[in-house]
From Swiss-Prot:
This is Valine--tRNA ligase. A motif ('HIGH' region) lies at residues 44-54. ATP binds at K523. Catalyzes the attachment of valine to tRNA(Val). As ValRS can inadvertently accommodate and process structurally similar amino acids such as threonine, to avoid such errors, it has a 'posttransfer' editing activity that hydrolyzes mischarged Thr-tRNA(Val) in a tRNA-dependent manner. The gene is valS.
Length: 876
């Protein structure tokens, strides 16, 4: 495709992805001569559109895999999706509800058919979104958490853990959704601050002598109270420990027990214990062997243990119960109280802590294994490193994990109950006399199968599988810091338990994508951004570059349309520079003609030197995952140096008569642009492919081109200082012209008083650049120059730049400008003098740093003296 005058992302990106995929560029090659690099995509839920967080995740992963492919690795970027138990089931049920049906009307088998249809529809939609983002995925290895291979892995893990005593069935307090009627994982519970009430009640002593004050936010749970606890160190209650109180309304006697869990400073210092409806109370109940009384059913209605409140909704019961207590003069006070209340992410229901018989994973031994691994050479590196402390803290404080869910969509638990004896059979296959058994109806928590993702996707439990042998462990996991516990930690302990290896070498953690004002993006706030809309407007390359470079590891990213647009402008700049270069290189120029051994100009040497420095910096920063710094490095090199300076300087030989110099310039343009496109390619795959295809090149695609390497033969350190001097001179002339409102089209004399003979010779040898950028009517460069009385002077590192001002300037204005400049150098001198006078700095700082400060002092002093001299001259 040709380079059209205007950059149009839709035209550039159209059809390119299909060409890459159909050509097999993203397929892992199983080339034994190459080192492997593997990333398995964090599987998105098959519930709808990908959000900006997914786009951020996958862009970073794609950058890493594209870069490693170019660096010669056998690269596998494995795609896949998650069945997302409750989320998908809720969507399918909502669709059925629109038809006036429930899942129970269909039955389990028919409902699951509907769920699989949903999965197929949305899986295609997700693939389309991956394509628009340009992700280099190996679709021949795509996996799904409910596919046959992963189901086999899930069954084996469950059975093995059960046989090891790591999975058990028992009673525990879980998060319960009374609308969806299922247990929830902690990540499926959204905590919101709500305005509620704090109720203070009287619990009368059984002996009739007074009462003890109890406070609660959930009065309806008091019907299940089985004790009162106080802190044994609380002087107020030492004499009542062992006594009993009467539970209001119900009349049940409750013992007063001592437990150090109670906070003496909070409320009255006495706490009711409801072991069946609060996780902390459950633990207290275990310590004191208390009865567990469940007072609600699975729908959130009060059950037969709730006496006269049976059949009432829990919140209606709360209201009536408080009225009844008021009637009996047992309410001390009711306070307004803002507190955090958990809501189901899917149904919106207020989550009920609920005692239920569920399947659990015994976490302590698994957590200890993960913690111990972090003390070995096989440890996992967290980026940023501070998140290892977060990981360790969660592992140390871990509780057993509820893994059963009262759903139909998911991995059905491989456990069967004997119809007559109640015996439990757990196995990878059903019992032989299946007619005597019934399978557990529950399914496993989605995170159970997701925890096996890095190795189950590669063929495990077949440890001889080619992909498992070659591509596991994986190299990097890229994900948000908000799921370190829910997913990252679980993959780590399952990887160690079942493969004996860490599942990935590095964990790169990013933050949340926030709205521009810093608020979290959400449907309720209406501030969400669809990444596909951004791509339609600005192109995938603009969005990818913004996501990759807009933040540093571990930090949140604020979405900004203005910043995406500025990157679109950056790509426009690249496009225009490339188009100019390609037009000047010419169609007949081939890659074999690139020759950098000839008589290189200063500009050639400088841009080649800066290119090599940029290659080195970008490679090092990428290896550290510092993509924000990579973005700044590439932006500065491409925009500030290649486009603004070298492209303009290349016009001198290209517009000249010297064919040899033209050929050298073509070589430099080709070499620099080719290497720059390769560096940019992982970030901006579409536009770089388009430009690269129009350059003289070897190979069929930039996807498979080699990553740039530093070429020491093309590093000319002296060129940087000379170019800096020239750029300073050119900028000072342009600034001076601006200040006196003199356009570049008007030729004026320019005098340069060089610091010494060497600088003078260098400037004379490169005066063509000053001519090109400054348009002087005459240019004088010498070490001694008689400066006109009325002149504008700028002090640069090369010397003084003088523009005669006769008829051009207001003298008073120029003196004021110079006095401001003098003040600037005075402040810099004061700062550096204080630093060098600081004994602590001089004694502790490295010698190199001290010398740099001394050099700064000398430079500032020279500039200060030069400006002061000009002020005196003008005033005279």
């Amino acid at each position: 495709m040709e380079m059209k005058p205007k950059y149009n992302p839709r035209e550039v990106e159209s059809g390119r992805y299909d060409q890459w995929v159909n050509s097999g560029y993203f397929k892992a090659k199983d080339d034994q001569s190459k080192e492997t690099y593997t990333i398995v995509i964090p599987p998105p839920n098959v519930t709808g559109k990908l959000h900006l967080g997914h786009a951020w995740d996958t862009t970073l992963q794609d950058i890493l895999t594209r870069m490693k492919r170019m660096q010669g690795y056998d690269t596998l970027y494995l795609p896949g999706m998650d069945h997302a138990g409750i989320a998908t089931q809720a969507k399918v049920e909502a669709k059925l509800n629109e038809q006036g049906l429930s899942r129970h009307d269909l039955g389990r088998e028919k409902f699951l058919e509907q769920a699989w249809d949903w999965k197929e529809e949305y899986a295609n939609f997700i693939r389309q979104q991956w394509a628009k983002l340009g992700l280099g995925l190996d679709y021949s290895r795509e996996r799904f958490t409910l596919d046959e291979g992963l189901s086999k892995a899930v069954k084996k893990v469950f059975v093995d853990m059960y046989n090891k005593g790591l999975i058990y069935r028992g009673e525990y307090i879980i998060n319960w959704d009374p609308i969806a009627r299922t247990a929830l994982s902690d990540i499926e519970v959204i905590h919101e601050d709500v305005q509620g009430k704090f109720y203070h009640f009287k619990y009368p002593y059984a002996d009739g002598n007074g009462y003890i004050e109890i406070a609660t936010t959930r009065p309806e749970t008091m019907l299940g109270d089985t004790a009162i606890v106080v802190n044994p160190n609380d002087e107020r209650y030492k004499d009542v420990i062992g006594k009993t109180v009467i539970l209001p309304i119900v009349g049940r006697e409750l013992p007063i027990l001592a437990d150090e869990y109670v906070d003496i400073e909070f409320g009255s210092g006495a706490m009711k214990v409801t072991p069946a409806h609060d996780p902390n109370d459950f633990e207290i109940g275990n310590r004191h062997d208390l009865e567990r009384i469940i007072v609600m059913d699975e729908s959130g209605k009060m059950n037969d243990k709730a006496d006269k409140y049976q059949g009432m909704d829990r919140f209606d019961c709360r209201e009536q119960l408080v009225k009844d207590l008021e009637a009996e003069n047992l309410v001390i006070k009711i306070e307004e109280h803002e507190h955090s209340v958990g809501h189901s992410e899917r149904s919106g229901a207020v989550v009920e802590p609920y005692l239920s018989t569920q399947w659990f994973v015994k976490m302590k031994p698994l957590a200890e294994q993960a913690l111990n691994n972090q003390k070995t050479d096989d440890r996992i590196d967290f980026v940023p490193a501070r998140f290892e402390k977060t990981f360790n803290r969660w592992m140390e404080e871990i509780r057993d994990w509820t893994i059963s869910r009262q759903l139909w969509w998911g991995h059905q638990i491989p456990a069967w109950y004997h119809k007559e004896t109640g015996e439990i059979f757990v196995g990878e296959h059903e019992p032989e006399d299946i007619e005597n058994w019934v399978q557990d109806e529950d399914v496993l928590d989605t995170w159970f199968s997701s925890a096996l993702w890095p190795f189950s996707t590669l063929g495990w439990p077949d440890v001889e599988a080619d992909d498992f042998q070659r591509y596991f462990p994986t190299n990097a996991l890229v994900t948000g810091y908000d799921i370190i516990f829910f997913w990252v930690a679980r993959m780590i302990f399952q990887g160690l338990e079942f493969t004996g290896k860490r599942p990935f070498n590095d964990v790169l953690l990013h933050g949340l994508v926030r709205a521009e004002d810093g608020r979290k993006m959400s449907k309720s706030l209406g501030n969400g951004v669809d990444p596909m809309d951004v791509i339609d407007e600005y192109g995938a390359d603009s969005l990818r570059y913004f996501l990759a470079t807009g933040s540093s590891p571990g930090h949140d990213l604020r979405y900004s349309t203005e910043k995406v647009e500025s990157i679109w402008n950056f790509i426009n700049k690249i496009w225009n520079a490339a188009r100019f270069s390609i037009m000047n290189i010419g169609e007949d120029f081939t890659v074999e003609q690139v020759d950098l051994s000839g008589d290189l100009s200063l500009a050639d040497k400088w841009i080649l030197t800066r290119l090599n420095e940029t290659i080195e910096n970008v490679t090092e920063l990428s290896d550290k995952y510092e993509f924000g710094e990579v973005g700044r490095t590439l932006y500065n090199f491409i925009w500030d140096e290649f486009c603004d300076w070298y492209i303009e300087m290349s016009k001198i030989p290209m517009n000249g008569e010297d064919e040899a110099q033209k050929q050298i310039t073509r070589s430099v343009l080709t070499y620099v642009l080719d290497n720059t496109m390769r560096m940019l390619h992982p970030f901006m795959p579409f536009v770089t492919e388009q430009i690269w295809q129009n350059l003289p090149h070897e190979g069929e695609t930039i996807v498979k081109a080699a990553w740039p390497k530093v070429n020491e033969a093309l590093v000319f350190d002296d060129s940087k200082e000379t170019m800096q001097q020239l750029v300073e001179i050119i900028k000072s002339v342009r600034q001076s012209r601006l200040e006196v409102d003199t356009p570049l089209s008007k030729a004026i004399p320019i005098f340069i008083k060089a610091k010494d003979e060497n600088i003078k010779e260098t400037l004379l040898n490169n005066s063509n650049y000053i001519d090109r950028f400054c348009h002087p009517s005459e240019l004088t460069i010498d070490t001694t120059i008689e400066i006109p009385e009325k002149a504008m002077t700028s002090v640069t590192t090369a010397g003084e730049v003088v523009l005669p001002l006769e008829g051009l300037i207001d003298m008073d204005k120029e003196i004021a400008r110079l006095e401001n400049e003098l003040l600037k150098w005075e402040k810099e001198l004061d700062r550096v003098n204080k630093k060098l006078a600081n004994e602590n700095f001089v004694n502790k700082a490295p010698e190199k740093v001290i010398n740099e400060e001394r050099e700064k002092k000398q430079t500032y002093q020279e500039k200060y003296d030069g400006v002061k001299l000009r002020i005196n001259q003008l005033k005279a």
